[in-house]
């Protein structure tokens, strides 16, 4: 995790520069207006030029990043920041200033669009939300430091707006250095181009270990778009006998053998009888079919069912049920029992076509304790001894004893990795094709119910879990395994972005979520308020609060703005802690009402004049409250969601669409705010923003699913499954 965290920190310097510039232009506009005597419409244009540049670059940044990679686009962003800083330092007139702001928009557009994508593609699922909150934290940190600089310069007799804006070139040099010499390319992008050796090395750097077999398998599977998907309710147990070498993986009793992405084990799974699956599959299908609200998207309930009553992330979450899930992608010499003898040879022919030493090191299981934190939490297991009446042995109730025994099944003290977030991936060969299984253990209550009430579990004693599986055809295609089984990734991605993929049901549903939340975020007014905070606070009378300090109204507004951004930082830290615990959806549903209340109180304080001091205090307090709760939820989460919900092959294209909507909305809000302030005043402006926040809460409740802790590939598959299942289902049932 250390490698992924450092890479995320380096990438988010681009967001630091964006935050720095947002605050700097807000402060510099006061002096630009005085120096150049600009009309109101031109004031908005100076600010909006960076937004125009961001919109222009965003329209092509996604497809280009799918073609050239994420890293080159981040390098270009750093170059744009550096050049625009130098030009703004020189700007002799408003025309040159507007050109510099346009270049600034190019840099900001690339950073805001691609940094969340880059982090999502390099971060483990367990901390992806936390790391993707770093752009908000560094952006707000950049704003705070910039306001400190602007406030200090405002105390001088003749502040220079050119110097304020030109300082941007200094931190942009650090960003340029890190993007060129430190940041690796996204491993998911590398896999999509068939550059398996490079992807493996990057994953090893990010994870801090040699064994990245599971991650490599998952990234290859992520190249798939669409395809038929089903859900199954399974009981899964460790295979404790030597299997044969045949490819048949289903016996006459319906018991399946699953091979996975790691070495030394295979597993047996059998479907849970339909009458006993109410805790798992049936409830999830019901979540798609039976809606308490007509307009509520069934996907919201489907995703929610995956997070209900899940095992806690803390504590010892290692598993004995999925310690070394077979090995399909490992190429070590010792093949596990029960696996087809030529299985690994077929996979090796693909993975090693450019590098003969791709084989996973067996020593990965002997890593020291410092490496344990790099491993994803695995399924906890239930160990039970059942008689013919399915009554559990008294000792089966001890979770502690169950987990203590979990490592004994393997003969060592280490568990292998899943694919992240407690998810696991298995494979079954059937009818000349491979089936891929994404497995997730049901919650504690579901497991307890399965032990007591599900007949047909593993006969006799044994260990098993009650798991739900999302099943689809693997990219290990329908060819004979005696030949080349895998469709090479470079052939899958050779055609570049697939515009036709935008018509896939899952992609369309994800676009509705991504575009909708980006539009509503902008029309909640945050960027307009940020750009014009000094003017807004000055009009609200904040100089009264700081008159005893002998500050001018302009300096006082800068100081209040700086203090506001300072208070935002601990709020973002709280959001970082909660992003992978409470989840994205929950944070939005809890923070948006606070935005509404703060805007309503701000409107009331403008309508009812108590005293100048009280009104100034209310206005300032509401602005601070609005900012703090915005950066906890509505600030980072739209970009986080958009970077998670699209398939790898079209992620750049879909992100470009969402980002273009983001920047167009930003332009409209920013350019219209000065006009609105002069026509309908603060009361009208913030009344509109409050109404949009109400609409936003309804949209989140109805349409936005929870994605915390889920691998990107699993998220996109569930979008596809949910959309397909709903489309093919009768109106009342699936």
From Swiss-Prot:
What residue stretch is flagged as signal peptide?
none
Task: Give the span(s) annotated as Disordered.
Answer: 351-403
Q: How does it sit in the membrane?
A: Multi-pass membrane protein
Superkingdom classification of source = Eukaryota
What the entry lists under Pfam families is as follows:
Sugar_tr (PF00083)
Compartments in which it is found: Vacuole membrane
Function (record text): Sugar proton-coupled antiporter which contributes to vacuolar sugar import (e.g. monosaccharides including glucose, sucrose and fructose), particularly during stress responses (e.g. in response to cold). Required for cytosolic glucose homeostasis.
Family of the protein in this entry? Belongs to the major facilitator superfamily. Sugar transporter (TC 2.A.1.1) family.
This chain belongs to which protein, by name? Monosaccharide-sensing protein 1
Lineage runs:
Eukaryota, Viridiplantae, Streptophyta, Embryophyta, Tracheophyta
Name of the gene this protein is made from: MSSP1
